[in-house]
């Protein structure tokens, strides 16, 4: 897949060898059709600009089985110290992810996305040529019809619909801040 721009990177090491990494960065799902910040409906306007996205995480096969949980938990403490009040993360069913690590580290599940995303793939190896975000940035195309029209003279490429991703949120404020955010968030938790 593709990964958005990240600003913070944390690793877990065993005997000096890097065994896992998590990366945090800008929100990728920035639909502002409602007029405000896209996460204001989850945490309230007051805290909406104090969030960050866990963009990518991975551990090597030989790492301890709880390495991912420890890495996420410790990195979230650092992110909280840097002033972030919440973190958003996604699980990708196409990559076999069901959000187990988020459930293990006490995140709230917000359900799956409803927006269809169209990616362009190579016919030979099924690798992604352009994802939905790049299609919009480079060509201002989001509808399947427009993308298929654009692809007519480009052999070897085809459109594929991505499965919606699961969305999770972790509150990281102090007790009072988390209570305020929960007033907004509570009805949305699945």
Regions found by a protein language model. Give the residues of each.
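Conserved beta-hairpin
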Residues: 6-26
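Short beta-strand-to-coil "C-cap" segments at the C-terminal boundary of structured domains/repeats
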Residues: 169-174
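Short, cationic low-complexity segments
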Residues: 180-190
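Short hydrophobic/aromatic beta-strand or adjacent loop that forms the aromatic wall/cage
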Residues: 7, 163-168
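Short loop/turn motifs at secondary-structure junctions and domain boundaries
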Residues: 1-5
């Amino acid at each position: 897949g593709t990964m958005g721009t990240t600003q913070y990177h944390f690793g877990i090491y065993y005997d000096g060898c890097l065994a896992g990494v998590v990366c945090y960065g800008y929100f990728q799902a920035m639909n502002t059709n409602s007029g405000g910040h896209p996460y204001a409906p989850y945490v309230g306007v007051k805290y909406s600009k104090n969030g960050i996205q866990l963009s990518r995480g991975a551990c090597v096969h030989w790492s301890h089985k709880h390495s991912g949980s420890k890495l996420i938990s410790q990195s979230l403490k650092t992110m909280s110290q840097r002033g972030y009040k919440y973190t958003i993360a996604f699980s990708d069913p196409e990559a076999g992810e069901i959000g187990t690590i988020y459930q293990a580290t006490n995140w709230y599940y917000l359900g799956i996305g409803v927006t269809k995303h169209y990616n362009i793939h190579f016919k030979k190896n099924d690798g992604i040529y352009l994802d939905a975000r790049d299609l919009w940035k480079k060509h201002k195309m989001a509808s399947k019809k427009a993308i298929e029209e654009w692809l007519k003279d480009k052999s070897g490429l085809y459109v594929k619909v991505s499965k919606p991703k699961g969305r999770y949120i972790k509150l990281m404020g102090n007790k009072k801040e988390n209570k305020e955010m929960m007033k907004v968030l509570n009805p949305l938790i699945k």
